[in-house]
Amino acid sequence: FLDYGSGYSLLKAIDSLPPNTKNVTFVEGDLFYTEEDFTKIIESKKNVVSINKEPIYANKAVVLYLDTQQHIHYLYDTAHKALNIKEPFCAIFNSAQMWKFNDTNYLQRVRKRLTNEQEEGTNLELIDAYFRDLENGSIDIIPIETWYNCNTVKDYHHVYKFIKAHENN
């Protein structure tokens, strides 16, 4: 995990799925979101990709974009310097980094097709490969209303203030 991050955890989880597992929900561990938003993902009958309302900056965003065929792609710069989409696209979003995989047989096939280099990459290697060729009708793009990526102490302080402000509601 120390070398490969959450991608390694995702691969190990897929390798260990019990037979007849209906779906897999994968969420980055440093996120803050509401139960209401998470419930939208869980209750969806489709595969799910999530988006948030944050601006897209290369130093922190995971980009989800739709190519001209409406296929989903992900982009992230591990160096946090610049993002480069090398093809025409129809839409671009900031990913909320929460996914639901509704076809575990397909998920396992995608996992088995990954190269060693992809396995050592980010979790987006598998996620991009899974969602890229799915039919649009089988995917819900769910906006997450309350979302914070807690990468820094400052981010955690922001979330703490949010929680305190909403404690009595």
Identify the meaning behind each predicted range.
Residues 89-169:
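Conserved alpha/beta core of the MobA/IspD/sugar-nucleotide pyrophosphorylase nucleotidyltransferase superfamily
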